[in-house]
Swiss-Prot record:
Record's keyword annotation contains NADP: no
One of the Pfam families matching this protein, by short name: LigB
Annotated organism of origin: Pseudomonas sp
Function of the molecule: Component of the 2-aminophenol 1,6-dioxygenase complex that catalyzes the ring fission of 2-aminophenol to produce 2-aminomuconic 6-semialdehyde. AmnA seems to have a role in the stability of the complex.
Protein name: 2-aminophenol 1,6-dioxygenase alpha subunit
GO molecular function: ferrous iron binding; oxidoreductase activity, acting on single donors with incorporation of molecular oxygen, incorporation of two atoms of oxygen
Annotated disulfide bonds: none
Amino acid sequence: MTIVSAFLVPGSPLPHLRPDVKSWESFKVAMQNVGEKLRASKPDVVLIYSTQWFAVLDEIWLTRQRSLDIHVDENWHEFGELPYDIYSDVDLANACIESCRAAGVNARGADYESFPIDTGTIVACNALKVGTSDLPVVVASNNLYDDQAATERLAALAVACISEKGKRIAVIGVGGLSGSVFTTAIDPAEDRVVKAVEDDCNKNILSLMESGNIQALREALKSYSKEARAEMGFKHFHWLLGALDGHFKGATVHHYGALYGSGAAVVEFSI
């Protein structure tokens, strides 16, 4: 396994569309900072899983060499556009597809002009400055029928496949923490995690990540998803666990805060 860096980042577009909101801008700055750390680790490819790329029938991988378009987020469309220009390592993506099939996982590629790239993938690529011609990505979808364990297995499969090619890998899980949001308009300057119990759950999980106590972390994860209404069952973190073979030494939380009531964090893992 040749993973050189690993990160958890939020997929919300708010920090990037509304950096005038100080608390949201802090997420943007933190993501720019970890992007520098990612690139300093000198990966050959960046392996991305975003909870916002939904798949149902199969496990879908992005197999278009260059995806160039303008995206408008389905929730925050009033705040502007997200242009993107994303380069993928098609050979590695196709190798992952073949590895999935060999393991009994139905998989196929997406290679279409104007294919709808999800907000989370776009945000991660733009903020961290990856998905370039010099640093391409391999992007996996979030199959809605996969649970946390299946997501860990998928990540492990992808890492093994790419490592066999002798590539250095940076891995990213894109998604938030607690899932409750404000359901009425708020002053963004007064944003906070909407439920105190979810705020406490988020802080506990982040503290366990920092400690590197995987056993205690896994035990806490059993209840975290329900108690915090975690985004997509926190599968993006399980993606990281699977990619890292269930082990990391600790973590640095570069920023934690609220995004319209939900919790989110920018986390760098020590591997």
